[in-house]
Each structure stands twice: as structure tokens, then as C-alpha cells.
Amino acid sequence: MAGRGGRVLLALCAALVAGGWLLAAEAQEPGAPAAGMRRRRRLQQEDGISFEYHRYPELREALVSVWLQCTAISRIYTVGRSFEGRELLVIELSDNPGVHEPGEPEFKYIGNMHGNEAVGRELLIFLAQYLCNEYQRGNETIVNLIHSTRIHIMPSLNPDGFEKAASQPGELKDWFVGRSNAQGIDLNRNFPDLDRIVYVNEKEGGPNNHLLKNLKKIVDQNSKLAPETKAVIHWIMDIPFVLSANLHGGDLVANYPYDETRSGTAHEYSSCPDDAIFQSLARAYSSFNPVMSDPNRPPCRKNDDDSSFVDGTTNGGAWYSVPGGMQDFNYLSSNCFEITVELSCEKFPPEETLKSYWEDNKNSLINYLEQIHRGVKGFVRDLQGNPIANATISVDGIDHDVTSAKDGDYWRLLVPGNYKLTASAPGYLAITKKVAVPFSPAVGVDFELESFSERKEEEKEELMEWWKMMSETLNF
């Protein structure tokens, strides 16, 4: 009885804290809608999903609503603040929220990087509510995902830009108003241009991954980086993300690396070493969206060049070159593979169309999330069973390595096939293993590395044994 009372009190306290947080947010937010507007929105909900645009206070309210409904599998946190002080909110869904469980991969969705591209923002709010609802209903797919994956959802990377775009009168919004952050910075051109570094390294030799290793301080000191950009860079570097998607608007296509062309031309297919798996990941999204994958779909605009589009996917450089983009930054600075998904021809479509966008994208969002459980996964440990962090996992024939996380766990996304994987770490002898990879689930391959000191001791013992044997044989 006391335990039940304690749980009720805890829930009540949580609700009061959340309510106070929301009231404070609305009091300080000049664009907050009136109470009557909020009541109207609640009347238009289905399964807790309000198919309407959420201004900043309403976004917070929607995330808190999910958290209060599914406290056991969710938490809300912030990675930083926008230039105007709005929080960059994330809702996490996991069977152990707030904790990296060894062997469990980390996934992220990011929306609304361009503030006037609003569909992704709303879809991610809807997705959080949907995952909560379906988990409580016992949906096997969703339950398995939440029990085996740590899912991070950031509905808006550019809340300042969204507020500017949403403040325009009428349904027809300007194509560019609110695209940039409050400083006028295009966030998807604001990341360190690691493509240029890796293109030089391809020719002259050099690292093929983690090109910002140990350079967090330099990022903080770079005055050209927006606060939103810096916050996401730290997020990417601090959590061992495996897979990600960045949701945009203005077209209908799933875009994969590289985004920036090698030659500097405007259009050129720019494959990365993991071109095969990236093509497969992009198709995993587009193929479940009936509009995006329709081969007879006309271009969004009369003069659009969609010649690079195949099955609703495109290589970024083949479409148009983007220097300083977040997608390639993920791939070249961390273990995270990210694609960019363009969700709608209109950037800020009428509110009444949001439900149809959800219906078109719901299965794609879930199917793409499931792709994190492909390829190879495992642990790198020493002979005593201690985890080895930052061990390098190399795949023969693919010039892009990944590294193990702090618990020695690693994940390597791959298409089906036969591979040779090598695990190595400073001070240890490398080990190579052969592995046959199916489509899914991921194959478990663990590595136990012997240190050089252990090998020397072993060789010394072998030499002593040999000397003893020779002494006995020759009667020394």
C-alpha cells in the first residue's frame, strides 16, 4: 500500500513539475497561442496525436504529454539552446532511458533544421506519441524496437526559424523566411567541412573516420559555428550513435552521402566508401513511402532536375553539392551513418495535409529505424574480459572504419555478403575474422585482443619451457 501511494505521489509531483515548466515556457514565449486555441487543438486529437502545427510551447507540451503517458520508457532532455534561447529538446524512448546499455545501438531523428521546412518537425512529434501508444498496446514491432534500441527524437533543431516562418500570416508561406537560424546562418552549411579533408586523405593517405577526434575545444572556440551547430556536434560526439536521419522539406527523396562533390562541380555522383549500405538505407525509407517511391511522380516544380533520383533516392552530390552539411559530418566525425530525407514538395504545407503526410511516412519512419539492427555488432575486450574503448573495426575492401564505444561495444552497418573484419587497438595484436552477413538481424562477432606485454610474457614462458626441455634432453 505504501509503495502504491509513493508511486502516485511521484506521478503527481512529475505532473506538477511538467505543468510548471510549461506555464513558465508559455509566459516567456511571445508567440504562444491563446488558451482557446489550445483547447481547439485538443479536440482535434486522435490517439493523442494532434495533426496540427505545434508552436514552441505546444511542442514542449506535446513531448511532456508523451513522457507523462510513458514515464517508464521515456525522458526529455535538451542538448543546448538556440540563438534566441529556446531549448533544443529531445525525447528519448528506451527500456532504460538515460542510460547507454552495452550492446544496445543508439538512433536519432532530427527535424526542422531549416525552420520553414515544417513537416519533419510535426512527423517527429507524431512519431513519439505513436511509439508510446503502440508500446502500451503491446505492438510487437514497437516493443522489440524500444527494448533493443535507444531512440532519440529531436523535433526541431531550429526552433527560432520555425517561429519566424510560422508567424507569417495566411497559409501560403514564403519559400525562404525562417530557413536560417536567428543569426541568418543556414545550419546545413555550417558544419566543419570534413569532406574536403577526407578527399585530400584519399589521395595522400590519412584517417578515414573520426576526423574531429579530440577537437571539441576547437569547435567551442569557432565563432563561425552557430550555437545550434555546436550543440549538435557535442551531441554527436558524446553519444555512440549508429544510425540517423535528418528530415527536410522542399522535395520528395531520400538523399545519401557524399553531399559535397569531389571536384567542386555543382552536380557529380560522389560515392562514399559505404555507398552500398547507404543506397540500401535510403531505399529502406523511400520504398515504404508510396509517393516518394512512385516512378511516375512528376517533379515538385516544373523546372526541377530529378534526373539523379532512382526509386525515390539520390546521391547528394549527384543532386547538388552541399558543403558543410550535417549528413556528411556525421559520417566523417563519428560512427553515425545519416541520410537526409526530403518529405514534401511544399516546405510549410497547409495544416490539414499533415495527417496524410503522417500516413505516407509512418511505415518509412519505423522501417528506417529497424535498419539499425543490420550488419555486424559485438564487443572488443582484452584477454581478461575488460572492454577496450576506441578499438578500430576495419572491413576489408571498405575504406571507412568504425570504433568501439566505452564499453567495448561496436556496430558496423553492412549489406548482405561475406566480409573480413579486423579489430585493432594501440598496444594490442590485431585479430581478423571472416563473417557471413545476412540482411538481418545483425551478426554478433566479438573480439578478444592480446596485449603486446601479454604476448612477450607468453613468448618468454615458451622460451623457458623450450630451454628446460633441451636441458633435460641433453643432460645440462
Curated annotation (Swiss-Prot):
Note: An autoantigen recognized by serum of pretype I diabetes.
EC code: 3.4.17.10
One of the record's GO cellular component terms: transport vesicle membrane
Lineage, highest ranks first: Eukaryota, Metazoa, Chordata, Craniata, Vertebrata
Protein name: Carboxypeptidase E
Tree of life domain: Eukaryota
Keywords noted in UniProt: Carboxypeptidase, Cleavage on pair of basic residues, Cytoplasmic vesicle, Glycoprotein, Hydrolase, Membrane, Metal-binding, Metalloprotease, Protease, Secreted, Signal, Zinc, Zymogen
Catalytic residues as annotated in Swiss-Prot or TrEMBL: E342
Proregion positions: 28-42
Family affiliation: Belongs to the peptidase M14 family.
SMART domains: Zn_pept
Transmembrane segments: none
Swiss-Prot/TrEMBL GO biological process terms: cardiac left ventricle morphogenesis; cellular response to dexamethasone stimulus; cellular response to hydrogen peroxide; cellular response to staurosporine; enkephalin processing; insulin processing; insulin secretion involved in cellular response to glucose stimulus; negative regulation of branching morphogenesis of a nerve
MF terms in GO: carboxypeptidase activity; cell adhesion molecule binding; cobalt ion binding; metallocarboxypeptidase activity; neurexin family protein binding; protein domain specific binding; zinc ion binding
Cofactor: how and how many bound: Binds 1 zinc ion per subunit.
Catalysed reaction equations from the record: Release of C-terminal arginine or lysine residues from polypeptides
Binding of Zn(2+), residues: H114, E117, H248
Membrane topology: Peripheral membrane protein
CC cofactor: Zn(2+)
Domain Peptidase M14 residue range list: 52-372
Region forming the signal peptide: 1-27
Glycosylation sites: N139, N390
Compartments it resides in: Cytoplasmic vesicle, Secretory vesicle; Cytoplasmic vesicle, Secretory vesicle membrane; Secreted
Organism: Rattus norvegicus (Rat)
Tissue distribution: Expressed in brain, heart and anterior pituitary gland. Also expressed in pancreatic islets and adrenal gland.
Subunit structure, interactors included: Interacts with secretogranin III/SCG3.
